[in-house]
Each structure stands twice: as structure tokens, then as C-alpha cells.
Amino acid sequence: MKCFHKIINSSSADLSFIPDGSVQLIVTSPPYPMIEMWDEIFFAQNPEIREDFQREDYTAAYRKMHDILNRAWEECHRVLSDNGFVCINIGDATRTLGKEFRLFPNHAAIIDFFL
């Protein structure tokens, strides 16, 4: 069997140039939902997220951020071989919003997607 390695530095949300089931390993480190340094990236991809923040509906914002990531996971799943692995570097988010300390379990949202 011929083996080759290729590093692709691009968004995992569009892997249309990669055939289905052809990848054995995906390593990705997406923007973390509900971590302030990544807010603007999510706002740019879906302006409704900024509106959710303005309305202080942080749960809706969190869900919409994961909707964005889910598009990437769909593509990863499509290109992944049956015996392949996806390694996702992401952490949970802790954040004080208003006067409330919140935990946003990013790992759980991703696990739920893949189950």
C-alpha cells in the first residue's frame, strides 16, 4: 500500500477537494466557542451570534458557534476513512458574562456530534 503525507493549512469546513473516505488522520485546532479572543471570528461567520451576545442570550450564541464547527466536523467525517482518527485540540470555556460565571463544555458538544 502506498502511503503519503500531506499537511493542509485551511478551514476544515470545506474539504471538497479531498475524496470521501481517503484520510486516515485529521489534526485540527479550531477556534474555541465562548473564549473571548475568538468571538470576532464567530461573529464574522454568523452575525446572529453578535446579536445573541447583545441580548445576553449566551446559550444561543454557544449553540450557533457549535453549528459553525459542526460544518467542519461533517467534512472531517466525510473524508475520514473507516479506520481513521480525528484529533481535535479544544478546551472547555469558562467565562464571566454579566455577573455570572459560566462553564461552556465544548468537549461535550463535539462528542455529541460524533456519537
Language-model-detected regions and their locations in the chain:
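S-adenosyl-L-methionine-dependent nucleic acid methyltransferase catalytic domains
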Residues: M1-L115
